[in-house]
Structures are given as structure tokens and as C-alpha cells.
Design a protein with these regions (language model features):
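Short, well-ordered beta-to-alpha junction loops that form the rim of enzyme active sites
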Residues: 88-91, 148-152
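Sec-dependent N-terminal signal peptides
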Residues: 5-15
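N-terminal secretory signal peptides that target proteins for export/translocation
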Residues: 1-3
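Generic beta-sheet signal
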Residues: 31-33, 143-149
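Sec/Tat signal peptide C-region and signal peptidase I cleavage site
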Residues: 16-20
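Active-site-proximal alpha-helix that buttresses catalytic centers in soluble enzyme cores
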Residues: 21-110, 115-119, 124, 160-188
Length: 188
């Protein structure tokens, strides 16, 4: 009976490690990128007259959102993602999420900016994102490429709504176009 429990525990641990290394191995390749919707920032859109230069005028992460971002970063590291190149939208809620993932410095990337205020820019924005991905997958080496962005950007890229803090493991072609994806719900 005791031996069965040990064997069961070892099997569970092996399955977990296989799953963990699968994510990190995929992210080391040039075929996969990880898109993340910023962590919880209650509300929809931004207040009237917001400014991208002034975080106080924007919708921002609350304390739960900050905790979510830290936890996601820790979870990714437990999955074997140790070395990552992180890019963020210019919005403060995305920059804060990127910083709290704790992979070192992140870079602001215009191709990740929200087009929520002008949905007519969806296709143009998605093409910019694809071009950005195409350029980065050629030069990232074995670093994971993590992009923190917005609901509308991810919806346009993959066609599915995701919640705050959720991630998408996206398989892409050399042009940065989506081939397939796996939704990774925000770990809790």
C-alpha cells in the first residue's frame, strides 16, 4: 500500500515535470511565443482624457492584479521558464504586469498597444504585432518571448476572449502569423 502511494506520487511528479519542461522547451524555440493579458485592472477601457504619460489617469492594476502578476511570474519560473525577453504595451497596467513578472527589464513595444479606443485599427494593429513577432523570433535565441498586452489585441490575434492574467502559448510561422494556440488560464 505504501509502495503504491510512492509510485503514484512519482508518476504525478514526472507528469508535472514533463508538462513544465514542455512549456519551457516550446518557448525556447523560435516557433512559440507567449502572449499575456495584463493582470486584473478593474473596469473597462480607460477614463475620459487619460494620458499614456500619466498612470494616474489610466485604469491600473489593483492589489489583486499586482499579486496575480507576481504569481504568474513565479509560476512560469516553476514551469522551467528561467530566461525571458519581456515586451509590454505602453499602458501602465501592462508595464506594471511586465515588471511584476520579475524577469528583469522589460521593453515597451508599440505593436502591443491597445486599439480599444478605435476598433477600426484592429487589422492594422494585428499586422504590426505579426511583424514584431516575426522579427523577434529570429533574434531571441533560446529566451522565452513574453508579450504583455490587452484583451482586444489578443482577441484579434487568435479570435478568443481571455481573462485578465491569462496567457496564450502561440505557435507562429516565420511571418509571425498564428498557426495554433493553447490557452493557459491564469494560475491560482
Amino acid at each position: 500500500m505504501y509502495m503504491k502511494a510512492i509510485i503514484s506520487a512519482l508518476l504525478v511528479a514526472c507528469c508535472f515535470l514533463a508538462q513544465a519542461s514542455d512549456l519551457s522547451q516550446k518557448l525556447k524555440s523560435s516557433d512559440y511565443v507567449l502572449l499575456m493579458r495584463h493582470a486584473l485592472a478593474p473596469g473597462v477601457g480607460d477614463p475620459a482624457n487619460y494620458s499614456l504619460e500619466d498612470c494616474k489617469t489610466q485604469r491600473n492594476l489593483n492589489s489583486e492584479g499586482k499579486s496575480q502578476a507576481v504569481f504568474v511570474g513565479e509560476w512560469l519560473k516553476k514551469q522551467g521558464v528561467k530566461n525571458a525577453e519581456v515586451h509590454s504595451s505602453v499602458w501602465c497596467r501592462c508595464k506594471d504586469t511586465a515588471a511584476l513578472l520579475n524577469f528583469g527589464e522589460y521593453k515597451v513595444e508599440p505593436a502591443l498597444a491597445s486599439f480599444f479606443d478605435d476598433m477600426s485599427k484592429a487589422k492594422e494593429s494585428n499586422l504590426k504585432l505579426q511583424r514584431f513577432i516575426a522579427g523577434k523570433i529570429k533574434s531571441k535565441g533560446d529566451k522565452a518571448l513574453i508579450m504583455v498586452t490587452h484583451h482586444v489585441n489578443i482577441l484579434e490575434f487568435m479570435g478568443e476572449n481571455i481573462a485578465s492574467g491569462d496567457m496564450v502559448l502561440a505557435k507562429v510561422n516565420p511571418k509571425g502569423e498564428l498557426i495554433s494556440y493553447k490557452l493557459i488560464p491564469r494560475p491560482e
